[in-house]
Amino acid sequence: MAAAGEADSNRWNAMRRLSRKVTQYSFRIVLALIVAGLAGCAASRGFDQAAMREALHLDSLSTPENQSVSHESARPSPPFRLGVFFVKHDVPDTPSIRKVEWLSADRDQLFRKLAPLRDEQLLADTFVLVDVTLRSDNVKGIRQAGARFGADMVLIIDGIAAVDRYNNRLAWLYPTLLGAYLLPGTESDALVMATGSLWAVRSDWHAPIQTVEIQSKVKGSAAFVEDATALQEAKQQAIHSLGKRIAEVLQSPK
C-alpha cells in the first residue's frame, strides 16, 4: 500500500511539474506574439499623401481650367435641383491608402449642411445620383445622368483615407499582458482627403474644385483602439468642411 501511495504521489508531482512547464511555455509564446505585434507598429510611418492625391486624381483636378470658374456659359439660375454623386472606388485597401465608404449617414450629414440653402431659395431639391456604371473621371457621364433625373447641377463627392497606427512610450509595458488592456499606449491617426466639384448639366459651367484634408486621432490600449473610429471621425469632419465650402460656392453670385 505504501509503495502504491508513493507511486501516486510521484505521478501527481510529475503532472504538476509538466503543467507548470506548459504554462511557462504558453506564456512565452503569448509574450513573443505581443512583442512581435508591437514591433510591427512601433513607430509612426506618417501618411503617403502623394499616393492619396494620385488616387483622387488631384493633380489633374488642380489644372487651371478646373480651379477657375468657367465663364464660357452662364451659371444656371436658382433655385437649383442638385444631384449629388458619391464616388465609389473598387480598389483594395493598401498600407498607404484606404477606400472611403460613403454611408447613408454621411449623405444625410451633407444634405443637412446644404439644407439652409433651400430657405435662401438657392436649392429647390437635393437628391443622390445612383449609377454603379459611372466612375469619378467620367464627368460627362455623371452630368448626363444628372440631366436624365432633372438636375440643374451635379455635385461629385470623392474621397480617400489613410491610417497611421503606432505605439507611444507607454507600450513598453504591454508585455505585462495586463498593460495591453489598460494602458493608452497605442495611437491611431486617420487622414481623410475629400473633394467636391460642381458642374452644370446643360452647359459647360463649373465651379472650382473644393478640397479638404482632415486628420483625427484615437488613443487607448492596444486591445481596444479601433482604426475605424478614427476614420469615421475624420470623415465626419471632412463632410462638414466640404459641405460648408460647397454652400459658400452656391451662395456666391458668380
Language model segments and positions:
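Extreme N-terminal basic, low-complexity initiation segments
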Residues: 2-7
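Sec-dependent bacterial lipoprotein signal peptides
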Residues: 9-10, 14-41
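Bacterial Sec signal peptide processing site at the extreme N-terminus
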Residues: 38-59
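Short N-terminal or domain-adjacent regulatory/targeting segments
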Residues: 52-81
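N-terminal segment of the mature soluble domain
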Residues: 78-165
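Surface-exposed short loop/turn segments
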Residues: 136-202
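Short secondary-structure boundary motifs at beta->alpha junctions and helix caps
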Residues: 183-193, 199-245
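C-terminal, charge/polar-rich interaction regions
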Residues: 245-254
